Structure formats: structure tokens, C-alpha cells
């Protein structure tokens, strides 16, 4: 007796009719298609990191400057002296604003103590007011108005 050959229906046309399924359309059940729609539960459980990763990340460190005005410096001068940020070196008063946590010296107000001030940044107005009374500024990286 001859055994009949079993049809395994492995071709691409089976279950779709004669002409359906010839093109590349209607592939919603294959691969990763539909992961955001009808396969969402599988995606959330087995591949939770599939979606995402969009957006913008700023990689430069941008910390805002901590400013101090000349008038404010005049007001807190005694407190800075008590905290050890004002010292005497070779008969000269040295004010270390950088160590006190300030980054920029602004020119509003007046400062009357002839001294040497250590700070990273200072405005042109602050520099001109201090040079008028004979003070000096050290470690000024850039001057901006």
C-alpha cells in the first residue's frame, strides 16, 4: 500500500487565497510589527526598554555663577573677616571671595577698603571702581558686563 504524501502547507499563500499575500503588505503579525499596539503586553513584560531613548541631554556642566555686588561686599566685609576670608599679607588686605563661594564680582554699589580681591570673574564696572580706590583683582578669568 502506498502512503499518501502529507501536505504541510508551508508556502506563503496558504490561508490567504490565491492572490492575497503576494506583496509585502499585511505583515502586522510578523517580527516586531505591532509592538506599540496589539503586542503591547508582551512588550511591557519581556522588552520594557524597547521604546524610549529619545530626547536631548546637555552634556556640558552649566552651573550658574554666584555673584556679589560691591555694595554687598561692603556690608558683609566684617562677617567675611570673622569667617577667615579676609587676611593681612605683607601689610595688604586680601579678600578671598573665591574661597567664600562667590564666582563673579558685580559693580553695583561702592566698596571703600583698599585691598586685593581674589575672584574668578568681574565686570568692567567693578574693576574700574576698585582700581579708582587703589584695589587690585586677581584670578579674573574673563570680564563680562
Curated annotation (Swiss-Prot):
InterPro entries: Rbsml_uL15_N (IPR027386), Ribosomal_uL15 (IPR030878), Ribosomal_uL15/eL18 (IPR021131), Ribosomal_uL15/eL18_sf (IPR036227). This is Large ribosomal subunit protein uL15. Keywords: Ribonucleoprotein, Ribosomal protein, RNA-binding, rRNA-binding. It comes from the Archaea. Disulfide bonds: none annotated. One of its GO terms (molecular function) is structural constituent of ribosome. It comes from Thermoplasma volcanium (strain ATCC 51530 / DSM 4299 / JCM 9571 / NBRC 15438 / GSS1). SUPFAM superfamilies: Ribosomal proteins L15p and L18e (SSF52080). Belongs to the universal ribosomal protein uL15 family. Part of the 50S ribosomal subunit. One of its GO terms (cellular component) is cytosolic large ribosomal subunit. Pfam families: Ribosomal_L27A. The keyword RNA-binding applies. The lineage of its organism: Archaea, Methanobacteriati, Thermoplasmatota, Thermoplasmata, Thermoplasmatales. Residues 1-33 are annotated as: Disordered.
